[in-house]
Every structure is written in structure tokens, then in C-alpha cells.
Amino acid sequence: PPQYPEHVKPKEIDGIIITHAHLDHSGYVPSLFVSGHSRVYATPPTLELSRLLIEDMLKIEKNYHPFDIPEVYNMLRNSKEIGFREKVEKGNSSFELRSSGHVLGGGTVLVESGKKRLFYTGDINPKGSRMLPEADLDIGEIDLLITESTYSQTEQKPRKQSEEGLIDFANEVMDRKGILFVPAFSVERSQEIACVFRNAKFKHKIIMDGMALKVNEIMFQYPEYLRDPKIFADAINHSVAIRNDRDRKNALMEPCVVISPAGMLVGGNAVFYLQHLAFDSKNGIALVSYQGDGTPGKKLLETGKVSSRGHDMKVTAEVRQFEFSGHADRNDLFEMIKNVKGNPKVLTVHGDNESCIRFAEEIHERFGLEAYSPQVNETISV
């Protein structure tokens, strides 16, 4: 079940900035409108995608949530759309969002208060992707850097290597007259994978299904946030959208690639495709999303089994995993910190406790900056 930061009290908040739509950054915000009415600031696509993901979470997950649909709409009514590099004045401080390269509309946050300047990375991808431009890191001198640490202890494979590996795997599956199932996150990852296949001039049919189709529609509304809207449009227009069960069954009548949420195989149409494709050795399953502990995707990787009709069943389709992270890896993070101007204090967040602590130690060792991993509820002075 999700863990919510319920120690955060609505009446203590002057404003809320949503960096991007992923639920670990947006999913608690509606609860702040059960008894509060703060202003929410985010880019237009972030607000649209947040609504989509939060509503889907409430519909699918049966766990406890400290809010419901009325609070989601209350959040949206109290939201102000802002663009990148648009300065917002708030009391004696100001802030602006900068492109993060992580997900459509996703931003970093640059805050100025008096003579002090703070930069929060949120989730960041300095290199960008086929879909998104690289992060905007032209931020000037700063006094405090709050950086994600998700992959601070990991060096990722070059994206080109992952793309080529995926295409090679797909061709192998097509050669044996099978179907390749690519479970992918609905926001950005599904579209990125479609672009990878289109760029490779893949000859077989590409199927897209599930909430990724709604995300496609939102992305078409905001071409200015994409690296190249023509590349995105070309990839989506050359894919086949699944609209109902009949389409779904017909799609599996010939060799093809199926891109569909959920990325970790938790619910969504992934369950349908697993039941129909996982137990035939001609088929393939390409995992291109992070697989969290306790998820069916993680179970598949570790045991080679999935739950089917109440029983654990051995998967006979070929399973491979490919790295397509939207986060900065270890080298990206060190490069970003090396290029930061000023002599900032550094806080390492958004990683497991051990990674955050080790990353802070390494930052101090490499750059001589004061760095540490803060505790929940800790007050930081700059």
C-alpha cells in the first residue's frame, strides 16, 4: 500500500509545487485539500497527467487513501498553470520551474528568497530522451542543492545499447512468428518505446493499449514540451490503438509488438496480455520499466513465474529486461554537481537511505561541499 506523508499539515503550507505527474510526486496533493485551500503550481501537462494518474489510482487500488475524487477536483480548482522559466512571486520569495528532461511537463524548481537561491532537481534526466529535451541546468549560482539520489550508486547502460537490444529481441520474436509484449509505464515510457521502434523502421505492427492512449492524447495537446513533435506524431500515427476487447483479441492473431501498461504488471491490460502470451515459447516479454519490490514484474524476473487463475505458473515466453530509465545515473549526477556554480550545501533525497548517505559522502569527498542526507521533518537553514 502507498505510504503518505501525513505529517504534512495543510494549514502550515503557503503553496504547493508539483514538479511532475508521477504519483510519488503528485499522489498526496489532493489530501491537502480535505481541510486546506493552498494554491498549486505546475505546468499544464503536469496537471492533466496528475489528474489522470490519481483518478486511475483511486479506481484501481483498494488500499486506504486519505482523500477521494472531490479532493482531486478541489486541487485542480485551486491550481495555477505556469510555464518553464515563468517567475512566480510568493511573499518575499519567488520560484520558477525549469525543464527536467524526466517526463512531459516535468520540472526542477529554482527558488530565490532574499539573497539565497535554492535548486531542487525533483526527478531529473540531464540527457533527455527521444521524447524530451535535456534538463535545463543553466541556473547560475546557488546556495542549496536538493538532489535526487535514485541511481546515485548505479551506472546505466548507454541508451543506444538498450534500444538496439530491444529491437534485436523483437526481431527474434517476429522471426519465430511470436508476439512481443512490452509492459510499460503509461506516461512517457510507452511513447518512448513506440518512438524507438519507429526510429528503427521496425516492419511489424506496433500495438498500443490501455491508459497510454489517453496519455498520447494529452501529449498531442502540448507539442511545445516535446523534443520533436513530428517524431512523436509519426510514432503514434504508425501504431494501432486498441479500443475494446474485440480489438485486443484480433491484435494477437499475427506477429506484432504490444506496448501496454502497467509497467510493473500490476493490473491494467497487462493481465490480459500475460494470460494470453506468457505460456507460449514463441512469444517474448520485454521489461523496460523499473520493477518495484513485491510487484508481479519483480516476481517474474526473480522466479520466472506469474499468477494465473489463482496459481503460480511457469512462464515459457522468453523474458528479457532493458534499461530505459528516465532518471540521471551516477555519472550524470556527479557531472551536474561538478558544473554547479557557487558553493552550495547539498541535500541528497529520493533514494533508499543507504544510497542517500553514501552519495552525500561521495559528494563531500569529490567536491569538498557540505553534503548530507536529511531526516523527515528536519528543518534546514541556509
Could you tell me what each predicted segment is?
Residues 1-17, 22-26, 31-206:
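His/Asp/Glu-rich metal-coordinating catalytic cores
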Residues 14, 143, 256, 283, ...:
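Conserved acidic residues
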Residues 34, 112-114, 135-138, 162, ...:
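Short, solvent-exposed amphipathic alpha-helical segments in soluble enzyme
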Residues 147-164, 182, 229-232, 315-331:
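Glycine-rich phosphate-binding "P-loop"
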Residues 157-162, 234-247, 264-266, 299-304, ...:
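A general structural motif
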Residues 167-289, 293, 350:
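Hard-cation-handling environments
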Residues 268-274, 325-340:
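A short, acidic, amphipathic alpha-helical segment used as a generic capping/interface helix at domain edges
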Residues 279-314:
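Redox- and metal-dependent alpha/beta enzyme cores, enriched for Fe-S-associated oxidoreductases
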